[in-house]
C-alpha cells in the first residue's frame, strides 16, 4: 500500500499545477461569485414543488408566480457566469501585467456578457431574443466567451492597441477610449464564431455544444463515469491535493445543468433521473467532507480505545457534521495514511453507486435544488430531493454502509495508536511519524511547544491593531483558525482580529489585512498568493495539515504563530 501511495504521489506536482491553472480557477471563482443567485433561486423551487410530494399542488397561477424569481435568476445563470468568470480571469491576468497597465475588469465583463448573448440567444420573431440557452444550457458557451474576451483584452493591453487620449482628458474618460478596440475585437471574434457555427450546423454556439457533448454527458452519468469523476475527488485529496479545485471546474456545467433539467422534469410531473448534480457531490459523495467521513469522528469517539483517537473524534464531530472535515483528515491523520487509503476512496464511490441505484431502479427523484455546501449531508439529501420517502431511507443506509466500510480500518488504526501509547510515545510524536514524510510540522511543533511552556503567549511583538485573513477553499476550514485567533486575542488582550475567507474571493478585501494565512487545502497556491501580497506589503504564511489543526485547537499557539510571521 505504501508503494502504491508513493507512486500516486509522484504525480502530485503535475496535478497541483492543474489546480493552479487560471482558467480552471476562473470557472470555480465565477461560480462562487454567482452562488447567491443559485441558492436564492432554489428557495422558490423548493416552495413550488416540495408540496407535490405530500399530494398538494399549487394552483397554476401561484406556481407561475413562485417560479418567476427562479426563471429570472437561475434562468440566466449562463449570462451572469459569463461576466463573473471574465472578472475572475481578468484578475489573474492582471497579476501578470504591470501595475500601470491593467485590464479593465468591468469592460471584460460587459464584453463577455454581450458576446455570450450573441452566441446563445437567438432572435425572437416578435422582437427581442430567446432565453432557452441563457441558463445552465449555456454555461460552456459562457466559459468560451469569457476566455476569448479576456485574452483579446490582454493582447491589446500588452501591445498598447488602444486609443490614447491627451493627458488633459480625465482618466475615466480615457479608459472608455482605451477599451474600445479590445471590446470591438472581442465582439467581432465571438460573432464570427457564431456565424461560422450557424452556417455549418444551423444552430447557435450554445445549442451546438449541447448537441455535440450530449453523448459525453450521458456516459458521465453512468456507473463508470460517476466512479471516475467522484473517485478522483477522494484520490486527489488523499495525496494532499484539493480535489475539488481540479474536478469541479471540469464538471460544473454538467452538475448545474442537470439540477435544472431535474427541476424541469419535476415541473412536468416526470422522474428526475440525472445523477451528476451539485447535491450528489456535496451530500452523497462527500457526506461529511471528502472521503464520506461523516461517520468517522463518531467512530473515533465511541469505538476507539486510544485516548488520542477519542480526543480527535470529539474535536472533529461538529465541523465534520457540517462538511468541514479537515480536523479529522489531518488530525488522525487520514490523508497519506496507508490504513485509510481503501475506505477513503471506496466509501464515496459506493455511496454514489447506491444513490444511482435508488434513482434508476427504485424511482427516487435525484437532486433538483441547490443547497449550501455546509448543509449536513443527511439533511441535504432529504431537502435536495424534495422530502422523498426514499431519501430518508437512503440517508440512513449511507450512514450504515460508510460505518461498515470504515469500521475494520478504524479498528486497525486504533490498535496501532494503542501500541504507540503503550510504548510511551506521546500523541504529538505519533502524529508526527504519520505525517512527517509529507507535511512539514517541525516549525509548528516548535511554536506549539514554546507556547505550552509559557504562562502567557508572547504577543508583545504585536503592539498595533493587526488584521489576519485566513483562506481556505470554501471558507469553512478557515473559520476554525479565525475563531481560535479571535477567542485567544480577546482572552489575552492581543490586538489581533481574524477573518475567514475563500481563496479566489479575497482580492477585493486583501488590502485590509496585514497577514494572510493559507490553510493546507490552498497551500499549493502560495507562490501565486505571494505575488499578490508582496505588491501590497502584506505578510503571507502557509500551513501544513497537522500544523493547521494544532493551531485551531490552541489559541495561544495560534497567536504565537501570528507573532512569528512579523519577526525579522
Swiss-Prot record:
The phosphoenolpyruvate-dependent sugar phosphotransferase system (sugar PTS), a major carbohydrate active transport system, catalyzes the phosphorylation of incoming sugar substrates concomitantly with their translocation across the cell membrane. The enzyme II LacEF PTS system is involved in lactose transport. It catalyses: lactose(out) + N(pros)-phospho-L-histidyl-[protein] = lactose 6-phosphate(in) + L-histidyl-[protein]. Residues 465-568 form the PTS EIIB type-3 domain. The active site is at 472 (phosphocysteine intermediate). Gene3D superfamilies: 3.40.50.2300. This is PTS system lactose-specific EIICB component. One of its GO terms (biological process) is phosphoenolpyruvate-dependent sugar phosphotransferase system. Keywords: Cell membrane, Kinase, Membrane, Phosphoprotein, Phosphotransferase system, Sugar transport, Transferase, Transmembrane, Transmembrane helix, Transport. The chain crosses the membrane at residues 30-50, 65-85, 103-123, 128-148, 183-203, 222-242, 246-266, 283-303, 339-359, 381-401. The EIIC type-3 domain forms the PTS system translocation channel and contains the specific substrate-binding site. The PTS EIIB type-3 domain is phosphorylated by phospho-EIIA on a cysteinyl residue. Then, it transfers the phosphoryl group to the sugar substrate concomitantly with the sugar uptake processed by the PTS EIIC type-3 domain. It comes from Streptococcus mutans serotype c (strain ATCC 700610 / UA159). Its main location: membrane. It is found in: Cell membrane. Induction: Induced by lactose, galactose and galactose-6-P. Repressed by glucose. It is a multi-pass membrane protein. The modification Phosphocysteine is found at residue 472. Residues 8-409 form the PTS EIIC type-3 domain. Its EC number is 2.7.1.207. GO terms for molecular function: kinase activity; protein-N(PI)-phosphohistidine-lactose phosphotransferase system transporter activity. The keyword Heme does not apply. The gene is lacE. GO terms for cellular component: plasma membrane.
Amino acid at each position: 500500500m505504501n508503494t502504491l501511495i508513493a507512486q500516486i504521489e509522484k504525480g502530485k506536482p503535475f496535478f497541483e499545477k492543474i489546480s493552479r491553472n487560471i482558467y480552471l480557477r476562473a470557472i470555480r471563482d465565477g461560480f462562487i461569485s454567482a452562488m447567491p443567485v443559485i441558492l436564492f433561486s432554489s428557495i422558490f423551487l423548493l416552495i413550488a414543488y416540495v408540496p407535490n410530494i405530500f399530494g398538494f399542488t399549487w394552483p397554476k397561477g401561484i406556481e407561475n408566480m413562485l417560479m418567476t424569481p427562479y426563471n429570472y435568476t437561475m434562468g440566466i445563470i449562463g449570462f451572469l457566469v459569463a461576466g463573473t468568470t471574465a472578472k475572475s480571469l481578468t484578475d489573474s491576468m492582471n497579476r501578470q501585467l504591470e501595475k500601470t497597465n491593467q485590464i479593465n475588469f468591468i469592460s471584460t465583463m460587459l464584453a463577455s456578457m454581450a458576446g455570450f448573448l450573441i452566441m446563445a440567444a437567438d432572435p425572437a420573431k416578435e422582437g427581442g431574443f430567446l432565453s432557452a440557452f441563457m441558463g445552465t444550457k449555456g454555461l460552456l458557451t459562457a466559459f468560451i466567451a469569457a476566455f476569448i474576451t479576456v485574452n483579446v483584452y490582454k493582447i491589446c493591453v500588452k501591445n498598447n492597441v488602444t486609443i490614447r487620449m491627451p493627458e488633459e482628458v480625465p482618466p475615466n474618460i480615457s479608459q472608455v477610449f482605451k477599451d474600445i478596440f479590445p471590446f470591438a475585437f472581442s465582439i467581432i471574434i465571438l460573432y464570427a464564431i457564431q456565424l461560422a457555427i450557424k452556417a455549418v450546423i444551423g444552430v447557435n454556439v450554445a445549442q451546438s455544444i449541447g448537441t455535440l457533448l450530449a453523448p459525453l454527458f450521458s456516459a458521465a452519468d453512468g456507473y463508470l463515469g460517476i466512479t471516475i469523476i467522484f473517485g478522483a475527488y477522494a484520490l486527489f485529496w488523499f495525496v494532499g491535493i484539493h480535489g475539488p479545485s481540479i474536478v469541479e471546474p471540469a464538471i460544473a456545467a454538467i452538475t448545474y445543468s442537470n439540477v435544472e433539467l431535474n427541476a424541469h422534469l419535476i415541473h412536468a410531473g416526470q422522474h428526475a433521473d440525472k445523477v451528476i448534480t451539485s447535491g450528489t457531490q456535496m451530500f452523497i459523495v462527500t457526506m461529511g467532507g471528502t472521503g464520506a467521513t461523516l461517520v468517522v469522528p463518531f467512530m473515533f469517539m465511541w469505538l476507539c480505545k486510544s485516548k488520542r483517537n477519542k480526543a480527535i473524534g470529539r474535536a472533529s464531530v461538529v465541523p465534520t457534521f457540517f462538511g468541514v472535515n479537515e480536523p479529522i483528515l489531518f488530525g488522525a491523520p487520514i490523508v497519506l495514511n496507508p490504513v485509510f487509503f481503501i475506505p477513503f476512496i471506496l466509501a464515496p464511490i459506493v455511496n454514489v453507486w447506491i444513490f444511482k441505484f435508488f434513482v434508476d431502479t427504485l424511482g427516487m427523484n435525484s437532486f433538483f435544488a441547490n443547497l449550501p455546501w455546509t448543509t449536513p449531508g443527511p439533511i441535504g439529501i432529504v431537502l435536495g430531493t424534495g422530502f422523498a420517502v426514499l431519501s430518508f431511507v437512503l440517508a440512513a443506509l449511507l450512514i450504515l454502509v460508510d460505518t461498515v466500510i470504515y469500521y475494520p480500518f478504524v479498528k486497525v488504526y486504533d490498535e496501532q495508536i494503542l501500541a504507540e501509547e503503550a510504548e510511551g510515545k506521546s500523541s504529538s510524536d505519533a502524529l508526527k511519524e504519520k505525517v512527517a514524510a509529507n507535511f512539514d510540522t517541525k516549525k509548528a511543533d516548535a511554536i506549539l511547544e514554546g507556547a505550552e511552556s509559557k504562562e502567557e503567549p508572547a504577543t508583545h511583538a504585536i503592539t498595533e491593531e493587526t488584521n489576519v485573513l485566513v483562506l481556505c477553499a470554501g471558507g469553512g476550514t478557515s473559520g476554525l483558525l479565525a475563531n481560535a485567533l479571535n477567542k485567544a486575542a480577546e482572552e489575552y488582550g492581543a490586538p489581533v482580529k481574524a477573518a475567514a475567507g475563500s481563496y479566489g474571493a479575497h482580492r477585493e478585501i486583501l488590502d485590509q489585512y496585514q497577514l494572510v494565512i493559507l490553510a493546507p487545502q490552498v497551500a499549493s497556491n502560495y507562490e501565486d498568493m505571494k505575488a499578490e501580497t508582496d505588491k501590497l506589503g502584506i505578510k503571507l504564511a502557509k500551513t501544513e495539515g497537522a500544523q493547521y489543526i494544532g493551531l485551531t485547537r490552541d489559541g495561544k499557539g495560534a497567536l504565537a504563530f501570528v507573532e512569528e510571521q512579523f519577526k525579522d
